[in-house]
Structures are given as C-alpha cells and as structure tokens.
Amino acid sequence: MYLINQNGWIEVICGSMFSGKSEELIRRVRRTQFAKQHAIVFKPCIDNRYSEEDVVSHNGLKVKAVPVSASKDIFKHITEEMDVIAIDEVQFFDGDIVEVVQVLANRGYRVIVAGLDQDFRGLPFGQVPQLMAIAEHVTKLQAVCSACGSPASRTQRLIDGEPAAFDDPIILVGASESYEPRCRHCHAVPTNKDK
C-alpha cells in the first residue's frame, strides 16, 4: 500500500469463496487496533453461517461485528471517534452500499470492504464491481481449485454434489457444503436444459 496523506479512502478485498477475504479483513482490522485506531465492523444480517454477531473466517478467525439489514443503517453506528469502517460480505448489501461507502470515505474514514466479485455463475456480483471502480486499493485474492489445484477465481455452487444450474437463485448462504473454489476451466454452470 502507498502512503496516503489525506484521510478517507476505500479498500476492496475480493475474490472467490475460500480465498481468504474475511481473513484479510480481520487482519487489517486487527492491525488498526494495534495502532490504537478505532474500528467498527459491519456484516449483513443474512450472513449467519458461523455467528450472528461476529465476522468469522472459514479458518475460525473472528472479530465482533454489527449486523445490519440495510446499508444506510450503518450511519446509525458511526461516531466521530471512528477511524476505520470495515464491511464484510458486501455483495449481500442493497444498492445503497456504494453511496454509503462513498460518503464515509469522503468524511475521512478508511473504509475496508470484502466480498465476492463474481456470483456462482461467474458473473459480476451485486455492487462489488462498482465498489472496485471507486476504490483507491483493490486486493483480488484467489483460492486453490478443488478440482485441479490451479489458482481459483470462481465459486462453484454444488447441489447434491452436482453443479447448480445457471438460473438457480443467486443468493444461497452456505459454506463448504454448498460451494467449492474453482479455476476458469473447472468451473461449470449448466443451463436447466443441460441437466
């Protein structure tokens, strides 16, 4: 990262499932705490896989978080003493999240967001592409393809061990029981006609 002389910027951490996005967000938040900065972490209410009130990485690291159901609810929890605002699973927030993040950065906060940049079909997911476009720093992480061992940039959704169809619902909260990291070549998304 470069030294930034002005306060207020946006950092995006993105990638496939199991690429370490939440782990990296937690690492950055912990570093701010060592620096005696005040950080607050948010997560969408829909993300209750491991905990209702913590951001938890797949390897078990965790940090306290405020669950919110709407992007603009974040403003209710911000105080002037805050230095850093972190938001996990940003792809699950409503369309207002881009404006919320912009406003916070413009007010002088360091805003760190983490989320999937692609849905299970391999298409841009939610507001993450817009956040990547307005961010000062973008970190794109990769996992390891569970099929061949290559770098994985995609998320394979599985239903009873088989790839989910293209027109299945986009949002399905889950972990290793429903998803695997895959490379471009091992990622499969059949249409319902193919099944």
From Swiss-Prot:
Q: What's a GO biological-process term for it?
A: DNA biosynthetic process
For this protein, what reaction is catalysed? Answer: thymidine + ATP = dTMP + ADP + H(+)
Name the Enzyme Commission number(s) assigned to this protein: 2.7.1.21
Q: Which family does it belong to?
A: Belongs to the thymidine kinase family.
Which Cys pairs are S-S linked? Answer: none
Top-level taxon of origin: Bacteria
The terms under GO molecular function for this entry are:
ATP binding; thymidine kinase activity; zinc ion binding
Positions bound to ATP: 15-22, 88-91
What gene does the UniProt entry assign to this protein? Answer: tdk
Q: Which NCBIfam families match?
A: PRK04296.1-1
Q: What is this protein called?
A: Thymidine kinase
Species per Swiss-Prot/TrEMBL record: Bacillus cereus (strain ZK / E33L)
Please indicate if the UniProt record lists ATP-binding as a keyword: yes
Report the GO terms under cellular component.
Answer: cytosol
InterPro entries in the record = P-loop_NTPase, Thymidine_kinase, Thymidine_kinase_CS
Catalytic machinery residues: 89
Q: Keyword Zinc, does the record have it?
A: yes
**What's in the keyword line of the UniProt record?**
ATP-binding, Cytoplasm, DNA synthesis, Kinase, Metal-binding, Nucleotide-binding, Transferase, Zinc
Specify which residues bind Zn(2+) according to the UniProt entry for this protein. 145, 148, 183, 186
> What are the subcellular locations of this protein?
Cytoplasm
The coiled-coil regions, if any, are none
Subunit annotation: Homotetramer.
